[in-house]
Amino acid sequence: MRNLKNIMRRHISLLGFLGVLSLWQVAGLLKLLPKFILPTPLEILQSFVRDREFLWYHSWATLRVALLGLVLGVLIACIMAVLMDSLGWLNDLIYPMMVVVQTIPTIAIAPILVLWLGYGILPKIVLIILTTTFPIIVSILDGFRHCDKDMLTLFSLMRAKPWQILWHFKIPVSLPYFYAGLRVSVSYAFITTVVSEWLGGFEGLGVYMIQSKKLFQYDTMFAIIILVSIISLLGMKLVDVSEKYVIKWKRS
């Protein structure tokens, strides 16, 4: 009995998830919910199998754009964070504008970027950069602010140059904060890519979702939503794995 309780306690999340899926499937079989509102889990699974080639093709297209935008966003965010930390006037100038941009919904910015930059890959990349830089910049700046003041004084007394203080002290201290922001930005990157694909294009999960909607393939639409969630979760998991290898001292 005790072993059974321990097993249930360890796997309570899995049991709850399976319970929800079971109720969902039963509700669908009893036709309590129309298919266009909520297809059954079995129908969504069948869609994964039936449309696997299309899902793979469009997933790879979305992944390419998301990764490119994320890499550029991370590079820009790191450079901006260092400059804003070093130059107080730059921080006072840029930070309020960044906050204003973050308050504007992504779906509202996307059409403007398409109008300015066309229907190619450029507006998608710009949109991803706009959504992914802010969490990383804020996290890195927060890490810089948590640097020990006594250590900074010690570096100054040792006549260390600014780049030496940055490389040997500030960056190592801010790495955990950087990874916290990176987790958020990874999920933003994939979601933003799909949103940008809604506005037009020839490939990508967002484009495929719109096509499925027009064909009333609601099971495929839900399969795409689940696939985007899985990709985002895998991306966040990769960030966790990377953090464990990069910041080995954090475990101790």
Where are these regions (language model features)?
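Transmembrane alpha-helical segments of polytopic membrane transport and secretion proteins
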Residues: 1-18, 237-252
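Transmembrane-helix boundary motif in ABC transporter permease subunits
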Residues: 68-98, 115
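C-terminal transmembrane helix and the adjacent membrane-cytosol boundary/short C-terminal tail
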Residues: 88, 145, 222-252
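Generic hydrophobic transmembrane alpha-helix motif, especially the helices
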Residues: 99-135, 142-143
